[in-house]
Regions:
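Conserved ABC ATPase signature
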Residues: 168-173, 177
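A short, proline-enriched helix->beta-strand linker immediately N-terminal to the Walker B motif
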Residues: 188-192
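Conserved ABC transporter NBD signature motif
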Residues: 81-93
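A short, flexible loop at the N-terminus of ABC-type nucleotide-binding domains that lies
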Residues: 18-22, 31-44, 75-81, 98-102, ...
Length: 301
């Protein structure tokens, strides 16, 4: 599929929903400067998100969705990275803050659940200690209080026999249990905005369903704003209020999630919808694939 120069399809119905604005992104660009040239990962993305709502960011691998989330959180580090535009969180432009100011926000007001819990958790440190250290760094609690809170969080994310598992190392847990620990750590300081970047990657279908339901439950109970990054439209169906569809670093469609599924307007979103496998399909029926290939981000037209 070639890069489309069609305008972004935007619905205004979700914009009128209640709640104050917690996040507003304006004309965000992120480029990586490589030996082969400038890789334009995010190109002029703008959107806003109301407090307590959930947003899905979907697109193929390489569409820029993860880079967008990391750019908002100021996590794209390196001398070869350039980010411009604005990302206002509770009225503060995150891109204008110093690293010290951002460190005060990371984990406390804004948190992220990463794709692979084996790389986001320290393999040499017991899981309970990792949550405890996170609490003690950002909250005025002693070790005993932090340990009890960590245990409560592990129980809350439904880790069986949390009392005995709190002293386990990450490799001693299954992939699903490790992701639950990552969620507990992200929720420890009660952030108002949570990014979940492909939180069910490499998990089996049953565990995926459990993790997604857990995130939805925590988001509702805490009245937390959540951004779910995924390549799978099935992940956001019935779980997010609004959706952005990204292609080649741009948002090509944004609307309420119900509208995305009921009356898709952009050809790329339609192609994504057609590519979803359905149980109603006859056996041996070829899967619908998106024709062509994504554009190379260093050689965009």
């Amino acid at each position: 599929m070639a890069v489309s120069e069609e305008p972004t399809y935007t619905s205004t119905s979700s914009e009128s929903m209640g709640g104050s604005e917690i996040l507003r992104v304006e004309d965000l660009h992120t480029s990586f400067f490589l030996p082969i040239g400038e890789l334009q990962a995010v190109r002029g993305v703008s959107f806003s998100l109301k407090r307590g709502r959930s947003l899905g960011i979907v697109g193929e691998s390489g569409s820029g969705k993860t880079v967008l989330a990391r750019s908002i959180m100021c996590l794209n580090l390196g001398s070869n990275v350039k980010t411009s535009g604005s990302a206002f969180f509770d009225g503060r432009d995150l891109l204008a803050l110093s690293r010290r100011e951002m460190r005060r926000l990371w984990g406390t007001e804004i948190a992220m659940i990463f794709q692979d819990p084996m790389t986001s958790l320290n393999p040499m440190v017991k899981i309970g200690r990792q949550v405890i250290e996170h609490l003690r760094q950002h909250k005025n609690v002693n070790r005993r209080e932090a340990k009890q809170t960590a245990l409560d969080l592990l129980n809350e994310v439904r880790i069986p026999e949390a009392e005995s598992r709190i002293d386990r190392l990450p490799h001693e847990l299954s992939g699903g249990m490790r992701q639950r620990v990552s969620i507990a750590s992200a929720l420890a300081c009660e952030p108002s905005l949570l990014f979940a970047d492909e939180p069910t990657t490499a998990l089996d279908v049953t565990v995926q369903h459990q993790i997604l339901n857990l995130l939805s439950r925590e988001q509702r109970q805490r009245n937390m704003t959540m951004v779910m990054v995924t390549h799978d439209l099935g992940v956001i169906a019935g779980r997010t209020d609004d959706t952005l569809v990204m292609y080649a670093g741009k948002v090509v469609e944004q609307a309420s999630t119900d509208e995305i599924f009921e009356k898709t307007q952009h050809p790329y979103t339609e192609a994504l919808m057609r590519s979803i496998p359905r149980t109603s399909q006859a056996s041996h029926t070829p899967l619908a694939a998106i024709t062509g290939r994504p554009p190379v981000a260093t050689h965009l037209p």
